[in-house]
Structure formats: C-alpha cells, structure tokens
Amino acid sequence: MSDNNEKQTLRTVEGRVVSNKMDKTVTVLVERQVKHPLYGKYIKRSSKLHAHDADNACNEGDVVRVTEIAPMSKTKNWRVVEIVSRAAV
C-alpha cells in the first residue's frame, strides 16, 4: 500500500479569468489542444473551472495558475495559486 507520508501530486493548470462576479470565486477558462483521432488535425478544447480566490485579487482577462483542492462547494474544487500575468487595462 502507499504510505501516508508520501505527498500526492496535485494537478495544476493555467487559464484565463473570464468572470469574477462571484464573491471569492473566479471562473477560469482552460484551453488545451488535442489531436483528432481520425484526421490528425489539432483542435482546441476548453473547459471552465470555478476557482477559490480568497483575496478577490483576480480581474477578468488575468492569466492565473490554479491547483486542485478538496471540494469547497458543489462546483468549486480549484484554488488560485498565483496570477501569472495581469490583463491590459
């Protein structure tokens, strides 16, 4: 079995903040490229995540790094680790 001393690696992704209208929560759009199984062309796929922003520091357009956490609510199980770049005002 696995020891409790081993630290589990947490999933970390980068994305763009598309909404900060909720209190202490931001919506992050994460885009990735996947190869089409038949035609081989790379296509964009995206997903929206709800992330915890304790300081309400993020604004729309910011690029942020988020990491997975234990669920905080029905849809929120990510946390903003850092703001990689600010949006141009």
Swiss-Prot record:
Short name of any one Pfam family annotated for the protein: Ribosomal_S17
UniProt organism field: Xanthomonas campestris pv. campestris (strain B100)
SUPFAM superfamilies: Nucleic acid-binding proteins (SSF50249)
PANTHER family: 40S RIBOSOMAL PROTEIN S11 FAMILY MEMBER, SMALL RIBOSOMAL SUBUNIT PROTEIN US17M
One GO MF term: structural constituent of ribosome
UniProt function note: One of the primary rRNA binding proteins, it binds specifically to the 5'-end of 16S ribosomal RNA.
Family statement: Belongs to the universal ribosomal protein uS17 family.
UniProt KW keywords: Ribonucleoprotein, Ribosomal protein, RNA-binding, rRNA-binding
Protein name (record): Small ribosomal subunit protein uS17
GO biological process: translation
